[in-house]
């Protein structure tokens, strides 16, 4: 029995979603396959989408070292965080330590620049 592919596609095109669902179930039973297995190759393409979704949106400003001029680093920490003198001094002396967490990239870069200008070593994580 010759079967025309175009006629088959036309028949599929005219089916409702419910009829298509029944067809998929019948194919699964007839050929012993699973529609979920068919989705696995598409999951590989989803891996690329997941990599894009993993792009970092929140950054933590980590003070690694206060540098030679600890006073300037303390002033910069106070400006960035709004901490008092004692709290800022304790934070600088406890390096490596997070100065600020959950910042946007622009805010994190600005804080990093301010700390580096004060002579501190800083990392964004």
Swiss-Prot record:
Q: Name one GO biological process term.
A: translation
Q: Keywords, A to Z?
A: Ribonucleoprotein, Ribosomal protein
**A Pfam family it matches:** Ribosomal_L12
Can you quote a single GO CC term? cytosolic large ribosomal subunit
SUPFAM superfamilies, A to Z: ClpS-like (SSF54736), Ribosomal protein L7/12, oligomerisation (N-terminal) domain (SSF48300)
Q: What's a single GO MF annotation on this record?
A: mRNA binding
The lineage's top-level taxon is Bacteria
Relate the protein's function as given in its record.
Answer: Forms part of the ribosomal stalk which helps the ribosome interact with GTP-bound translation factors. Is thus essential for accurate translation.
* Family statement: Belongs to the bacterial ribosomal protein bL12 family.
Query: Could you tell me which HAMAP family the record lists for this protein?
Result: Ribosomal_bL12
Q: How does it assemble?
A: Homodimer. Part of the ribosomal stalk of the 50S ribosomal subunit. Forms a multimeric L10(L12)X complex, where L10 forms an elongated spine to which 2 to 4 L12 dimers bind in a sequential fashion. Binds GTP-bound translation factors.
- Name used for this protein in its record: Large ribosomal subunit protein bL12
| Organism whose genome encodes this protein | Variovorax paradoxus (strain S110)
Gene name of the record = rplL
